[in-house]
Amino acid sequence: AVMGGVALLVFPVADSIINFLWYSFLPAPDGGISECGTASTGACPRVYNPLALLLARLKVASLAGLIVALPVFVYQTYLFMRPGLYPNERRYYLAAVPTSLVLALVGVAFAYFLILPVIFVYFLNYSEGVAEIAFALTETFDLIILMMGLFALIFQIPLFIMLAIMMGVTTRKWLADRRLLFWFSFGGIAFLCSPDPTGMAPLLVALTMITLFELTLGLLRWTGR
């Protein structure tokens, strides 16, 4: 319900968000966005089916809803588990609600400022001198939205690990002893969830997941947990 409500609020301004995201990573026409559709330089979005723009708007609205809904989901899970939690476990879970939102925003920012620029620079240089890329709205925007949503979820890894350890579900040693299994699992998830045949996006996703996993274990070891 929360995700749907936020999506409805964002949908009317989705076109502005689409243009902002698109030209954050791809070159705009020399004469500005209004030059799209004419013979101009720049990576204007290409629409190859009548529903492409509508679906792009829905994806933007859904991403906003997902980010806001993450802490709500954590809180709803807390309400479900609350009768069986000890007082200290309840404190941990309540603290996780705002932390989840912060981590989701950090994940989106990480994708926006670091991951997506690297991916699109790689794409632009990949075929330079061989072919001119026509960036389709659907496929290109799917990648942008997927990376932002995926990194919002990926950055929950430290939170989930810490909650599991603090609540006695697992231990740092158990996770550390099986790190290679987690690494391979992260790699498999990255290649399944990242629609990039060049392999650049899955590689960056997998490296980020492994790094977050190891940094969390390092922090727990440093704090003596």
Across the structure, where does each feature detected by a protein language model lie?
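Membrane topogenic/interface segments and analogous intrinsically disordered interaction regions
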Residues: A1-R225
